[in-house]
UniProtKB/Swiss-Prot annotation:
Pfam families: B3. This is AP2/ERF and B3 domain-containing transcription repressor TEM1. Residues 71-126, 195-306 bind DNA. One of its GO terms (cellular component) is nucleus. Residues 1-73 are annotated as: Disordered. Transcriptional repressor of flowering time on long day plants. Acts directly on FT expression by binding 5'-CAACA-3' and 5'-CACCTG-3 sequences. Functionally redundant with TEM2. Induction: Expressed with a circadian rhythm showing a peak at dawn. Expressed in leaves. Keywords: DNA-binding, Ethylene signaling pathway, Nucleus, Repressor, Transcription, Transcription regulation. InterPro entries: AP2/ERF_dom, AP2/ERF_dom_sf, B3_DNA-bd, DNA-bd_dom_sf, DNA-bd_pseudobarrel_sf, LEC2-like. Gene3D superfamilies: AP2/ERF domain, DNA-binding pseudobarrel domain. It is found in: Nucleus.
Length: 361
């Protein structure tokens, strides 16, 4: 077929003229230049919360959905229009929570940076606690994790306000109330004792929980109830968070819940830390109090056991041997009556016979 095209002189010029006109090339170029049926756009994520779009038609980079950057340190915009706060500790990001207002997120960063870096840290706003150290004392009384937890749950302002009322007066100066709390009987009478509990070995052991006596729990710390086939029972949810202040002004956060398995009310999260810091041991007494004022603030403190724990050997329900003084527990025997006394006499007789046999051998 190629030979016939070359031998025909009449068609040579046509073939040459046709070859000079770039019809195939034009068709190919049209095919290459025409956009595909489905337009394809490549996305490249940029920094600062913006995404860069590579437009395949004109080859230009265009910005879309660019989030406005914040003018405050430690504040980052969120796609939903809210603002997040963050701080870096040892090259790791610590998330402080999400807030509706940009200034609120900036204030949360300022609180965190004063706890993490100290009072001289660079903040977004001028510190409002110059001239008194109420907030500094509050920050020092709580760990970094506790401050971050308050900021995330938006409870920092409430807890600081409770502490500030006991720390400063109307002029913003120390009121000395923290010392009066322990030295003034009138202040002590402003609290009512709810109940006391002597902690058991399991309360201060590896179970990491404190069992609240049922009668006191239902009276002073009632939980929302739910209707079941057995009647009204406390809601078996994850429980609620309660704040209790100790005598140093430190606020302790405990998770208070109801366990269906053991049908008991317990303090779980936060309790093990309280045991460790206060060095609680079995036999110590934990006291729960409530203020008589309108705030109804809850308090917790503890007392060392009045006498050392004595290990007693029991046989058939009778205290027969006291390990601490290595003598028979005469007091326990005297309280049980004549029957237990006769049993104790028989036991003593048996011990003396065994001792006599050993001496003979």
């Amino acid at each position: 077929m190629e030979y016939s095209c070359v031998d025909d002189s009449s068609t040579t010029s046509e073939s040459l003229s046709i070859s000079t006109t770039p019809k195939p090339t034009t068709t190919t170029e049209k095919k290459l230049s025409s956009p595909p049926a489905t337009s394809m756009r490549l996305y490249r994520m940029g920094s600062g919360g913006s995404s860069v779009v590579l437009d395949s038609e004109n080859g230009v980079e265009t910005e879309s959905r660019k989030l406005p950057s914040s003018k405050y340190k430690g504040v980052v915009p969120q796609p939903n229009g809210r603002w997040g706060a963050q701080i870096y500790e040892k090259h790791q990001r610590v998330w402080l929570g999400t807030f509706n207002e940009e200034e609120e997120a900036a204030s949360s960063y300022d609180i965190a940076v004063r706890r993490f870096r100290g009072r001289d840290a660079v903040t977004n706003f001028k510190s409002q606690v110059d001239g008194n150290d109420a907030e500094s004392a509050f920050l020092d009384a709580h760990s970094k994790a506790e401050i971050v937890d308050m900021l995330r749950k938006h409870t920092y302002a409430d807890e600081f306000e409770q502490s500030r009322r006991k720390f400063v007066n109307g002029d913003g100066k120390r009121s000395g109330l923290e010392t009066a709390t322990y030295g003034n009987d009138a202040v002590l009478r402003a609290r009512e004792v709810l109940f006391e509990k002597t902690v058991t070995p399991s309360d201060v052991g590896k179970l990491n929980r404190l069992v609240i006596p049922k009668q006191h729990a239902e009276k002073h710390f009632p939980l929302p109830a739910m209707t079941t086939a057995m009647g009204m029972n406390p809601s078996p949810t994850k429980g609620v968070l309660i704040n209790l202040e100790d005598r140093t002004g430190k606020v302790w956060r405990f998770r208070y819940s109801y366990w269906n398995s053991s049908q008991s009310y317990v303090l779980t999260k936060g309790w093990s830390r309280f045991v460790k810091e206060k060095n609680l041991r079995a036999g110590d007494v934990v006291c729960f109090e409530r203020s008589t004022g309108p705030d109804r603030q809850l308090y917790i403190h503890w007392k060392v056991r009045s006498s050392p724990v004595q290990t007693v050997v029991r046989l058939f329900g009778v205290n027969i041997f006291n390990v601490s003084n290595e003598k028979p527990n005469d007091v326990a025997v005297e309280c049980v009556g004549k029957k237990r006394s006769r049993e104790d006499d028989l036991f003593s007789l048996g011990c003396s016979k065994k001792q006599a046999i050993i001496n003979i051998l």
